[in-house]
Amino acid sequence: MRKVAVVIGSQTDLPQCKEGLTLLQNAVESGQIQLYLDSVFISSIHRATDDTLNQLADISKSEDVDILITGAGWANHLTGVCDAYLRYGLDDVRTRVIGVAFEDKDDQTHTQAAVASIVNVPGTQVIYQDDGGIFIGADGFTRACQFAISDELPAIKLPEARPQVRMSLADAIAKGG
């Protein structure tokens, strides 16, 4: 049975999650999936960084979470950090990450930034769309939940990690052109 975890960046995003969370609840009740710790985690990568990373470590250590649904608005760093930390920090090549960009109806530049922060990450393994398009807003979250319940999960293909490079200030200036 597939096991799903959910991490949302803010409680203010929950109204966009209601239909999708209801879909997950129905799937749990019908025995289609299990929800990790029977919980939805609300955790800001900016304001609760350690808590978020510790939760990801717990999810990874459980060794039975197949898919992590992440959702956040504005710049949505949550999704990319979850994917990068699982892959390169925890060496987790089992848990797939679905990213949802939540809408800001008052300022579409926030919505656009949330989308760009998911789809424009080089080497990302984040699942951010289905046949209906990119996972954006309430409809996108619902479709992401449906994908987590019933779609075939893609294999994770990691690009080669890039080691940190340390150089002198003079060398950095020289390499800068």
Predicted regions located by residue number:
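Short, solvent-exposed amphipathic alpha-helical segments in soluble enzyme
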Residues: 20-26, 56-57, 84-87, 115-117
